[in-house]
């Protein structure tokens, strides 16, 4: 479904099963794996006796320290504009492109940042808030496309 929606409706494309099931690139499995990765980090955080709150999570996020953290925050800030444009133009591929760019921004942040091993509690809480916000945004976006994320892959 994601593979179909990620292509501009007015353009021809070749159905390629290998591309649609790949865990790399702008594909459904890549997006879903990113969401599952975030859920896994949050579950590990909870296992250490910490609580993840959904409400007001944005208030815990500190100003960005690194390049990838800032890039993730900037990508999150584009949400309203992308959703409005996607619906106004009946262009689900634009929402898919945003989802892919957000997943890429998260994965860069994940590779650059030791989220769970951060020693400063306020910084760690900020990271947890940021990835909680990212997970929620990704799940809302795929939900708009009629897709649900699994708990595990």
Name every feature range the model reports, one short phrase each.
Residues 1-153:
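Non-catalytic interaction-recognition regions
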